[in-house]
């Protein structure tokens, strides 16, 4: 089958970018143009010969434009197989003329529902019915019909028509058809996502879950140079999230895959301290290696850095308030890969930009704390709710004879916020709202405790008077006894071990105050 010459075009677009110039050139190539509503007016106002779709259907647009192209003379003209003699005869018998080119983009549903306080009625009116129907009909019959949904493809179509006596190539028609089904799939998912937000979680729950991924950024590589990688916008039942919605890179080379993981880790942790005293978080390989609060950012930085004076080199630092000059000068004394803050005060950017390899990132708004987490495995996708439930001071259950002091409670709460952001098994020592020793990612909780104590001793931090947090219960008393030996005075842990009584007795024997949260924070 030879490539069909484009003689008739149906044009109906919401996004009118480039449509006048495109249709003017189509007209100059001898293409007969039919159009609808606002598009028809735009073309006619520009002096382009275009006829109403009603001249094909013999039926007016009705119901405020809801019904205009849903007609056999439209879809017959799109779906007829030109090489099928029976189709050709039926088309002729019913006064159906072939349509060779469809130029349609859809009502801006996603842009509409993204507006603040959009009404349900406005959202519903922006669900396109006729547009997707025409696109799908044209795309199905891509052997004969060229279908364009993206103004970026106008030039390609014109180029091929000029080079091929008014026809497009089979390869191009197939490529454009693929874009149609990608578009309509994404469009329907956006509608379903919006409607899911209008019903209760129980009503919306289903045995299947759909997500959409649209590439936002190409990464230089993945975790390692031999791995390809990219960052994709994600749309699920909680809406669409993208990097650019929450962050803006102000300086530095492009962000890597590992950078993105570290940014997610750093900002998820700093969110725990939104609105609190000046707080600094230092991240290395997604684990916090230093976290501290103080009366100023510069003091918080020095305290966080003192937890581990080696790991912060090449690390990621997040601040819970605008980065001021004093803190910037202190941080600038070492090389850090990424600095993240809600803003940078006057003069700070000029100072920090002198290091070309450093990335400076503004966090524009708070990250969502609820929603789903997705983890890919070779055998399927694991889905879980985010670990976003909060343990308040009132939720703590004191299980020992000694009650914790107010100062101990403050440190226990500080430690618990950090604990859930560290890879399991986690043991964390905190003193005066500063991490003193971080034991992360060990197969044995006792080993995590030993590492945390060793890290503190390496930088001469005295654990006497500190508190300890464990992301899961102590299965035996040995971990707690090791903490007591280090000088800990209070303990926070989920509880729930069959040996809780044994652990509580050990705490009482060492005059420790211990609280249970009733909530575990494993992080794999």
UniProtKB/Swiss-Prot annotation:
Gene3D superfamilies cross-referenced by the UniProt entry: 3.40.140.20, Methylglyoxal synthase-like domain (3.40.50.1380)
InterPro entries: AICAR_Tfase_dup_dom_sf, Cytidine_deaminase-like, MGS-like_dom, MGS-like_dom_sf, PurH-like
Metabolic or biological pathway, per its Swiss-Prot or TrEMBL entry: Purine metabolism; IMP biosynthesis via de novo pathway; 5-formamido-1-(5-phospho-D-ribosyl)imidazole-4-carboxamide from 5-amino-1-(5-phospho-D-ribosyl)imidazole-4-carboxamide (10-formyl THF route): step 1/1; Purine metabolism; IMP biosynthesis via de novo pathway; IMP from 5-formamido-1-(5-phospho-D-ribosyl)imidazole-4-carboxamide: step 1/1
Catalytic reaction list: (6R)-10-formyltetrahydrofolate + 5-amino-1-(5-phospho-beta-D-ribosyl)imidazole-4-carboxamide = 5-formamido-1-(5-phospho-D-ribosyl)imidazole-4-carboxamide + (6S)-5,6,7,8-tetrahydrofolate; IMP + H2O = 5-formamido-1-(5-phospho-D-ribosyl)imidazole-4-carboxamide
GO biological process: 'de novo' IMP biosynthetic process
Keywords assigned: Hydrolase, Multifunctional enzyme, Purine biosynthesis, Transferase
GO cellular component: cytosol
GO molecular function: IMP cyclohydrolase activity; phosphoribosylaminoimidazolecarboxamide formyltransferase activity
Superkingdom classification of source: Bacteria
UniProt-listed PROSITE patterns: MGS
Domain MGS-like, chain residue ranges per copy: 1-149
Notes concerning its domains: The IMP cyclohydrolase activity resides in the N-terminal region.
HAMAP family, alphabetized: PurH
Protein name: Bifunctional purine biosynthesis protein PurH
């Amino acid at each position: 089958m030879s490539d069909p010459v484009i003689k008739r075009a149906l044009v109906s677009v919401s996004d009118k970018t480039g449509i006048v110039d495109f249709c003017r050139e189509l007209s100059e190539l001898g293409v007969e143009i039919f159009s609808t509503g606002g598009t028809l007016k735009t073309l006619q106002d520009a002096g382009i010969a275009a006829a109403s779709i009603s001249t094909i259907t013999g039926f007016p647009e009705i119901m405020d434009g809801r019904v205009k192209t849903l007609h056999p003379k439209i879809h017959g003209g799109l779906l007829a197989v030109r090489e099928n003699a029976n189709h050709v005869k039926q088309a002729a018998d019913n006064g159906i003329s072939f349509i060779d080119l469809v130029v349609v983009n859809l009502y801006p549903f996603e842009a509409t529902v993204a507006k603040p306080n959009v009404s349900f009625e406005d959202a519903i009116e922006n669900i396109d019915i006729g547009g997707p129907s025409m696109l799908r009909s044209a795309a199905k019959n891509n052997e004969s019909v060229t279908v364009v949904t993206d103004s970026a493809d106008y030039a390609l179509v014109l180029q091929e028509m000029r080079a091929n006596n008014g026809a497009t190539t089979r390869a191009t028609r197939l490529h454009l058809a693929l874009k149609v089904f990608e578009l309509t799939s994404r469009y329907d998912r956006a509608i379903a996502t919006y409607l899911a937000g209008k019903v209760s979680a129980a009503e919306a729950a289903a045995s299947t879950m759909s997500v959409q991924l649209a590439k936002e950024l190409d990464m230089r590589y993945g975790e390692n140079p031999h791995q390809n990688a990219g960052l994709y916008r994600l749309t699920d039942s909680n809406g669409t999230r993208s990097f650019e919605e929450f962050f803006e890179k102000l300086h530095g080379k492009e962000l890597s895959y590992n950078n993105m993981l570290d940014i997610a880790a750093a900002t998820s942790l700093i969110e725990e301290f939104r609105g609190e005293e000046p707080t600094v978080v230092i991240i290395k390989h997604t684990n916090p290696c230093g976290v501290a609060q103080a009366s100023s950012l510069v003091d918080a930085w020095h305290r966080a850095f003192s937890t581990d004076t080696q790991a912060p080199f090449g690390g990621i630092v997040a601040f819970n308030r605008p980065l001021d000059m004093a803190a910037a000068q202190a941080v600038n004394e070492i090389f850090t890969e990424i600095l993240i803050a809600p803003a940078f005060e006057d003069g700070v950017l000029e100072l920090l930009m002198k290091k070309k390899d450093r990335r400076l990132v503004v966090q524009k708004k708070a990250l969502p704390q609820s929603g789903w987490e997705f983890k890919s495995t070779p055998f399927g996708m694991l889905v879980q709710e985010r670990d976003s439930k909060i343990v308040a001071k009132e939720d703590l259950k004191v299980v020992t004879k000694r009650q914790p002091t107010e100062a101990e409670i403050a440190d226990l709460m500080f430690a618990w916020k950090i604990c859930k952001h560290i890879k399991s098994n986690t043991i964390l020592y905190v003193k005066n709202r500063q991490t003193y020793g971080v034991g992360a990612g060990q197969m044995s909780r006792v080993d995590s405790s030993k590492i945390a104590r060793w890290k503190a001793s390496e930088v001469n931090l005295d654990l006497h008077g500190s508190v300890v947090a464990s992301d899961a219960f102590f299965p035996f008393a040995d971990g707690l006894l090791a903490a007591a030996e280090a000088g800990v005075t209070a303990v926070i842990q989920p509880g729930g071990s069959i040996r809780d009584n044994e652990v509580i007795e050990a705490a009482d024997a060492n005059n420790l105050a211990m609280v249970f949260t009733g909530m575990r924070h494993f992080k794999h």
